[in-house]
Amino acid sequence: MMPQLETATYLTQYRWTLIALFLLFSFLVVSVLPAVKTNFLIRRSIGAGWTGAPKTSDLNKGPASLWSWDKI
C-alpha cells in the first residue's frame, strides 16, 4: 500500500504540514511583507511627485496601515 493512504501516518503528515505552513507564514510576515511594504511606500512617494509623499512616520507603522483604503 502507498504510504500516503495509510491511516497510521495521517496524523504525522497533518502535523508536519501544519508546522511547515506555520514556518512559511512566519517567514513571510517577518521578512517578505515588511520589504514589500517599504517598497510600496517608496514607490508611492516617488509617484506622488513629493507633494503627497507620506511622512517618515508612515514607514514605521504596523502592517495594518498598508491595507487602509483611505491612504491609497
UniProtKB/Swiss-Prot annotation:
Entry annotated with the keyword Glycosyltransferase: no
Cell compartment(s), UniProt: Mitochondrion membrane
Cellular component per GO, a single term: mitochondrial membrane
Transmembrane parts of this sequence: 16-36
Principal localisation: mitochondrion
Membrane-protein topology: Single-pass membrane protein
UniProt entry keywords in alphabetical sequence: ATP synthesis, CF(0), Hydrogen ion transport, Ion transport, Membrane, Mitochondrion, Transmembrane, Transmembrane helix, Transport
InterPro entries linked: YMF19-like_N
Key word Nucleotide-binding present: no
GO BP annotations listed: ATP biosynthetic process; proton transmembrane transport
Domain of life: Eukaryota
Described function: Mitochondrial membrane ATP synthase (F(1)F(0) ATP synthase or Complex V) produces ATP from ADP in the presence of a proton gradient across the membrane which is generated by electron transport complexes of the respiratory chain. F-type ATPases consist of two structural domains, F(1) - containing the extramembraneous catalytic core and F(0) - containing the membrane proton channel, linked together by a central stalk and a peripheral stalk. During catalysis, ATP synthesis in the catalytic domain of F(1) is coupled via a rotary mechanism of the central stalk subunits to proton translocation.
Family (UniProt): Belongs to the ATPase protein 8 family.
Subunit annotation: F-type ATPases have 2 components, CF(1) - the catalytic core - and CF(0) - the membrane proton channel.
Protein name: ATP synthase protein 8
